[in-house]
Amino acid sequence: MAISIKSPKEIKALRKAGELTAQALALLEREVRPGVSLLELDKMAEDFIKSSHARPAFKGLYGFPNSVCMSLNEVVIHGIPTDYVLQEGDIIGLDLGVEVDGYYGDSALTLPIGAISPQDEKLLACSKESLMHAINSIRVGMHFKELSQILESTITERGFVPLKGFCGHGIGKKPHEEPEIPNYLEKGVKPNSGPKIKEGMVFCLEPMVCQKQGEPKILADKWSVVSVDGLNTSHHEHTIAIVGNKAVILTER
């Protein structure tokens, strides 16, 4: 399937969805602390989104039961909110999507709960810095595979590894569209191959960072993804539009 080019009107609608996504994440960022349960946070986000005349995009998507993916400590992505109460030293990944008037926004961040270990601080910084470096590297005409190479090299230069088998993606009237954008260059693939970035494209970049091994394992809940190394992980994501030959973050907080 071809990668869709969005009109200025569509990008305006996607910007609206992105802004609401960012506001919902900012709300959670303010409320995350020791003593708060994951289900409480999920309800806060859902109530805020609905009160803004929008819809939590993840609730029911592929059967996901909640509004926010909450990935605790070793869980990289797709964690299901539970009654677990956050404790000092935890790290929590928050990934949420919003649908407004038929258009989607999608963003994620990983937060420390109080004081965390120096290794976890480096881990959180890696996914955030990898995301921003990739965004700042975007140029019209470059290949998406070049972005994958940039993401991988930024992660590995910091001593970590990208999660395999999961990727960034296009977004628009569907939460997941073409292209798929891995955080690594697949074996045998050249960076100067495949589709190129063009004006009007809208997509999500989301580095998912593991400590020692990038091979994934899905837990018994059939959603939560961890690394086979069982160590803590980190994940950041933004929705980006190509406007005026440059990358514009639609989910900037």
Curated annotation (Swiss-Prot):
| Keywords of the record | Aminopeptidase, Hydrolase, Metal-binding, Protease
Q: Where is a divalent metal cation 2 annotated to bind?
A: 106, 169, 206, 237
| One Gene Ontology term from the biological process aspect of the record | proteolysis
The cross-references to Pfam families, in alphabetical order and at most eight, read: Peptidase_M24 (PF00557)
Q: What is its EC number?
A: 3.4.11.18
Q: Which amino acids does the record list as binding a divalent metal cation 1?
A: 95, 106, 237
Top-level EC class = hydrolase
Is Phosphoprotein one of the keywords?
A: no
What catalytic activity is recorded?
Release of N-terminal amino acids, preferentially methionine, from peptides and arylamides
* Keyword Protease among UniProt keywords: yes
Q: Name one GO cellular component term.
A: cytosol
Cofactor remark: Binds 2 divalent metal cations per subunit. Has a high-affinity and a low affinity metal-binding site. The true nature of the physiological cofactor is under debate. The enzyme is active with cobalt, zinc, manganese or divalent iron ions. Most likely, methionine aminopeptidases function as mononuclear Fe(2+)-metalloproteases under physiological conditions, and the catalytically relevant metal-binding site has been assigned to the histidine-containing high-affinity site.
The UniProt annotation places substrate binding at: 78, 176
Gene Ontology terms, MF aspect: initiator methionyl aminopeptidase activity; metal ion binding; metalloaminopeptidase activity
Cofactors demanded by this protein: Co(2+); Zn(2+); Mn(2+); Fe(2+)
Which InterPro entries does UniProt cross-reference here?
Answer: Creatinase/aminopeptidase-like (IPR036005), Pept_M24 (IPR000994), Pept_M24_MAP (IPR001714), Pept_M24A_MAP1 (IPR002467)
Protein's job:
Removes the N-terminal methionine from nascent proteins. The N-terminal methionine is often cleaved when the second residue in the primary sequence is small and uncharged (Met-Ala-, Cys, Gly, Pro, Ser, Thr, or Val). Requires deformylation of the N(alpha)-formylated initiator methionine before it can be hydrolyzed.
Subunit structure comment from the entry: Monomer.
Assigned protein family? Belongs to the peptidase M24A family. Methionine aminopeptidase type 1 subfamily.
HAMAP family, alphabetized: MetAP_1
**Protein name per the record:** Methionine aminopeptidase
